[in-house]
Amino acid sequence: IDPTSKDSQPSLERAAWVAKRSQSAVELLICEYNSALDGGFFFDGPAQQKARESLLNNLSIWLDKLAQPLRDDGLTVTTEVRWGKPLHSMVLQRIDELKPDLVFRDATTHSLLQRLFFNNTSWQLIRQCPVPLWLVRKGEWKAERMCAALDPVHSADTEAVLDHLLVESTAHLAKTL
């Protein structure tokens, strides 16, 4: 879940849509980091820790508010808020712990400068996520077509384990949805 986008959460909407049709559970995850609350000059140790805990608590409350309508619809929804950086490592750590069947992430557009000089979380997840990753854009999806992006080179995975998992997952989703 993107804590900077209070209005729209496309990945949440898509995850709920898929969960309803597949009778799956959902976990909503926020990974947060703010350098001002981590060894910054603005706070002493105890005040810094209190500010960080307050931020994480507020995010947890907000996440529970997002989860409640899904729970009211009968879905099993858990929430998790984590602190750390880089964000993609925090997400991958939770994926390793939870072992989900599918991960949803909002697809965002980045400027040329951001693409050239920064390793954003989405790109890192595309490269490193050990389970199928569904990048979600705003707007309704009509479920008419599905496409799985595979790695034709397999430099890190000689047996193409993830590719086989992607094909199987996509075929299963196509039948289910």
Per-segment meaning from a language model:
Residues D7, K65-V103, H110:
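Structural beta-alpha unit
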